[in-house]
């Protein structure tokens, strides 16, 4: 009857509604290991228990430090996998979906693993012209590696868009023409890939600046609505996540979906890695962008980072910490451990609130019942966590 039909409809609605807080933790990796470890060990288990008791919900933190399989890395799919995970969080989470840890490292800037034929051939023309003008520039002579490593695939064509664009989707201009593409070969059997990558990266970046001066200008880079394929030679994976996980959201959605943690280490720029070999987690180069054999500060990367952080809405900053260089983040330092605890507590409060709001949306009970359950939970959850619990989700 009608009553049964109503119950069935309500059950179906609940089945389709997201029942998890699914969150992408976005940052450069080598400089935020301790923050990530602390959040996964201390905050995640608490949120999981809180969500479970609040109506059988889930809390998930997507951790990409171990999320890129070797084969995917060899095929240069790191950026694509990260963006897919971010999109999945935005689609599947009933609340917060993106947390950005803003520190002092801009991070990995891969060039696209697929370049539309017309763009690739234009870039080669620019490099050839630059080489004719500057025959002794070694960076330009490395353009021959582009011809060796990129191969035209006539069958590689992006599908027609069959759905209405979602809010966080990269624009058509950022995706570029549909193909065919020049596709980057696998690096699986290349022992000196890093050197080859850096040579091609410099050459492509130099050509992109000349070919697309307007699209790569500071003004264009500050406007997420004007993203262009040219910028894919310049921006880091972390900034692309930041653009799609925060900047492209409406002002109303940002407040429900994104949070930012800021950290500044005093004395980092003055520190040095020269002299004795430092253990992992204590090297300056893990915490800030360095370039070349002399390990000088990468001023271009730092400029991009400053611009990115400058675009962060202040009302989304849940915590801001300032600490002294350890070296690194030193778990033997009371100041550093206090910083980690305060950071985790501030984030936990916001995520707990997000879970509570999500519980109201997916629950068939009145809001007052959910709030009463939440009050009991705040009193009843007292758990000691020994060691680290890592939760890892892949697409």
What is each stretch, according to the model?
Residues 375-395:
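Walker A/P-loop phosphate-binding element recognition
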Residues 1-379:
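Conserved catalytic or regulatory cores that recognize and/or transform ribose-phosphate-containing ligands
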């Amino acid at each position: 009857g009608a009553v049964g039909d109503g119950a069935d409809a309500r059950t179906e609605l609940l089945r389709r509604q997201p029942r998890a807080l699914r969150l992408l933790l976005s940052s450069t990796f080598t400089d935020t290991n301790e923050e990530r470890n602390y959040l996964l060990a201390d905050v995640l288990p608490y949120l999981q228990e809180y969500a479970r008791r609040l109506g059988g919900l889930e809390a998930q933190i997507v951790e990409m430090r171990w999320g890129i399989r070797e084969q995917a890395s060899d095929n240069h799919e790191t950026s694509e996998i990260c963006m897919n995970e971010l999109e999945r969080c935005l689609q599947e989470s009933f609340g917060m979906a993106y947390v950005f840890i803003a520190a002092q490292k801009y991070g990995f800037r891969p060039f696209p693993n697929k370049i539309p034929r017309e763009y690739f051939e234009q870039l080669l023309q620019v490099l050839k012209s630059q080489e004719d003008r500057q025959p002794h520039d070694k960076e330009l002579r490395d353009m021959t590696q582009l011809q060796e490593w990129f191969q035209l695939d006539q069958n590689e064509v992006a599908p027609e868009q069959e759905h209405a664009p979602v809010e966080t989707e990269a624009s058509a201009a950022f995706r570029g023409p549909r193909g065919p593409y020049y596709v980057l070969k696998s690096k699986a059997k290349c022992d000196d890939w890093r050197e080859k990558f850096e040579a091609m990266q410099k050459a492509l970046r130099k050509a992109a600046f000349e070919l697309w001066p307007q699209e790569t200008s500071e003004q264009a880079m500050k406007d997420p609505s004007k993203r262009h394929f040219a910028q894919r030679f310049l921006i880091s994976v972390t900034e692309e996540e930041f653009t799609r996980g925060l900047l492209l959201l409406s002002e109303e959605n940002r407040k429900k979906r994104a949070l930012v943690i800021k950290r500044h280490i005093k004395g980092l720029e003055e520190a040095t890695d020269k002299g004795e070999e430092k253990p992992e987690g204590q090297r300056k180069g893990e915490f800030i962008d360095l370039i070349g054999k002399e390990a000088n500060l990468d001023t271009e990367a730092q400029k991009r980072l400053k611009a990115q952080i400058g675009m962060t809405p202040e009302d989304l900053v849940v915590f801001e910490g300032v600490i002294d260089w350890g070296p690194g983040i030193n778990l033997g330092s009371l100041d550093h451990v206090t910083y980690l605890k305060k950071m985790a507590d501030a984030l936990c409060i916001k995520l707990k609130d997000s879970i509570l709001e999500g519980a109201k949306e997916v629950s068939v009970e009145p809001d007052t019942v959910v709030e009463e359950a939440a009050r009991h939970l705040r009193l009843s959850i007292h758990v000691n966590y020994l060691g680290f619990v890592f939760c890892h989700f892949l697409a």
